[in-house]
């Protein structure tokens, strides 16, 4: 029975009745109805102002982010929706971000050794996605009945937008973009341009990839989204090419600045430049950076791991 609930499906759900939805989610019908009516009451919004890591450049602007933190029982229901409805979908090949089994490495690999790489960022993607767009995803794209689409929209949106912090939001953001980017996909297919997405990061590569910029910007603008010019990057092969924080060109790699900052972090630990009050957080930050490097290039991560281990042994942080 559980296998049929979680069976891989195409980009369609075709849920027409409340009883079918309740079965797929393994939840009582009355719970879905009652919680959808008061879903907005279960959020605890806050503004996230991340403290810069001690090894980060102090001049970097700290980015504030509004988090629409969902709590139980809504959080539990959203997790069910993600795991049983959204995660099992057969996602289009060009969508990478937020898709189980896909990684940053997989996202950048198709663009390796490209003559030109173009990247665009969608500004404030989650807050700009509307309830109407989410409803259309459930209804038009995934084939749910109007009643079911409305119920699922109430369970997965907050104050008329896609909530940052909900487990369903990345998948729904992917689907919203997929529902509006047909002109982009068609143009890329026609001009033999490789196109991939990582949530709000769009990447294009190929001889004619520069030509897709106007098409992409117009398609996004027509659906209420913006792609700031300052976030547009055109990277020919003779320049340094990078995507979602990874260095490209011949093979995926770590940006030089990232490696340097990580080594600097270990050095500051070794020389006692880190206040005792912040040492645990600092070490976690360095460990996180090394884990990221290990994912991309285990060989380059090994010396950093050893250096950090020796440092921690000597300083006993």
Over which residues does each language-model region extend?
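Short alpha-helical functional segments enriched in proximate histidine and acidic residues
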Residues: 187
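Right-hand nucleic-acid polymerase module
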Residues: 1-57, 62-120, 125-147, 151-166, ...
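Catalytic palm active-site di-aspartate
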Residues: 119-123, 165, 169, 190-206
């Amino acid at each position: 029975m559980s296998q049929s609930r979680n069976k891989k499906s195409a980009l369609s759900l075709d849920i027409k009745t409340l009883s079918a939805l309740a079965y797929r989610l393994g939840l009582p019908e009355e719970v879905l109805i009652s919680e959808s009516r008061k879903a907005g009451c279960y959020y605890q919004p806050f503004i996230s102002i991340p403290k810069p890591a001690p090894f980060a450049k102090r001049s970097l602007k700290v980015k504030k982010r509004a988090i629409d933190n969902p709590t139980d029982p809504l959080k539990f229901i959203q997790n069910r929706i993600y795991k049983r409805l959204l995660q099992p979908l057969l996602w289009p090949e060009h969508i990478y971000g937020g898709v189980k089994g896909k990684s940053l490495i997989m996202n950048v690999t198709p663009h390796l050794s490209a003559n030109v790489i173009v990247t665009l960022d969608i500004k404030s993607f989650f807050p700009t996605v509307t309830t109407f767009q989410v409803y259309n995803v459930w209804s038009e794209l995934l084939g749910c009945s109007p009643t079911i689409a409305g119920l699922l929209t109430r369970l997965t949106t907050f104050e008329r937008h896609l909530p940052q912090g909900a487990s369903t939001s990345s998948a729904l953001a992917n689907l919203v973009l997929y529902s509006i980017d047909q002109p982009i996909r068609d143009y890329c297919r026609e001009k033999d341009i490789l196109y991939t997405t990582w949530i709000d990061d769009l990447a294009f590569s190929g001889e004619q990839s520069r030509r897709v910029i106007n098409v992409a910007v117009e398609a996004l603008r027509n659906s209420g989204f913006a792609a700031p010019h300052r976030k547009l990057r055109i990277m020919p092969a003779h320049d340094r090419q990078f995507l979602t924080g990874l260095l490209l060109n011949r093979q995926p790699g770590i940006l030089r600045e990232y490696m340097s900052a990580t080594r600097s972090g270990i050095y500051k630990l070794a020389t006692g430049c880190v206040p005792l009050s912040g040492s645990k957080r600092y070490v976690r930050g360095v460990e996180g950076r090394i884990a990221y490097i290990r994912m991309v290039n285990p060989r380059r991560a090994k010396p950093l791991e050893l250096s950090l281990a020796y440092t921690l042994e000597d300083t006993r942080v």
